[in-house]
Amino acid sequence: MTASYSPSISVPLVGLVFPAITMVLSFIYIERDEIV
């Protein structure tokens, strides 16, 4: 793997995976808060 392929992988990874993790964690936090 060369450095030229790095942006095409890291940009979608940060742009899609990070918001997805944030949404899941916030959803779990809200669900726990409602249950308790």
From Swiss-Prot:
It is found in: Plastid, Chloroplast thylakoid membrane. Keywords: Chloroplast, Membrane, Photosynthesis, Photosystem I, Plastid, Thylakoid, Transmembrane, Transmembrane helix. InterPro entries: PSI_PsaI (IPR001302), PSI_PsaI_sf (IPR036357). Disulfide bonds: none annotated. The keyword Chloroplast applies. May help in the organization of the PsaL subunit. This is Photosystem I reaction center subunit VIII. It comes from Huperzia lucidula (Shining clubmoss).
